[in-house]
Amino acid sequence: MDNIMSKLISKSEIEKFNKDGAVFLKNKFDIKWIEKLKKGIERDIKNPSPRFKSHTTKPNVPAYLEDYWTWDIVPEFKEFVYQSPYAEIASELMSAKKINLVMDNWFLREAGSKSSTPFHHDISYFDMEGTMCVLWLPLQETGKDEGVSWVKGSHLWDKLFLRVLFKDGHKVEGKECILNGKKYELPPDIISNKEKYEFLKWDCELGDCVIFDMRTLHGTLSSSIPNKTLSRYTLRVAKEDTKI
């Protein structure tokens, strides 16, 4: 994923990413990529990896599904990783000379699913330091209250929050502690204190995406239940300054 000079991102978009912790990018991905990723998810569901899981605890109800680290076994995902414009976009946003892949995954929330995404930030799930960003690419047209919301500016709080499990109930993993010199705190109760925060959320058409800092808190803000199945593909990538 070596950097290729381009003009995919404007100065204003870079400034928003740095200041807000998330930026909406309009029509950056051709529809062919959306269709390939949807086919990849279908292929993965038929032959899932050992990491495939449902975050829905009740049986026989609409589910919230996920699989990850499958880019090297699902050809559609591998093609996206190597040939889509995301590496260029990410390198421009982070002023990177080189982009390294950290993790790929996808989520699928079936129509009628009551399961949702807890508020969390991705950095806590990885033992890494450096500059990293995440692609959030919806594979269906998604209203701003159907997708994820981001807490504006939360990447600049200089805080690390404990992991939150995606499984229904959203249990916090572990207790407040200092680990390897880093302080991990309980995540804030965003849902019960919405008035304290400013949120970023967007209506997304096919080809639109959101890219956000690994430290930015995000999750499902609305209690609405989707009336259609919604899926999204994500990629986490790191600048050359990142270390494990």
Predicted regions span which residues?
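Non-heme Fe(II)-dependent double-stranded beta-helix
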Residues: D2-D20, K26-F119, Y125-F126
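A short secondary-structure junction signal
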Residues: S113, T117-H121, G130, D145-V151, ...
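Short, structured patches in soluble enzyme cores that scaffold and shape functional sites
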Residues: N105, H121, L137-E141, W150-K152
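A short beta-loop-beta micro-motif enriched in histidine and acidic residues
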Residues: H120-M132, Y197, C204, K228-L230
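Non-heme Fe(II)/2-oxoglutarate
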Residues: N47-P59, F161-D168, L206-I211, R215-I244
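Double-stranded beta-helix
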Residues: K144-L217
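Short, conserved beta-strand element in jelly-roll/cupin
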Residues: D127-G143, R236-E240
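Short, charged/polar surface micro-motifs in flexible loops or helix N-caps
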Residues: Y86, A96, A111-K114, Q140-K144, ...
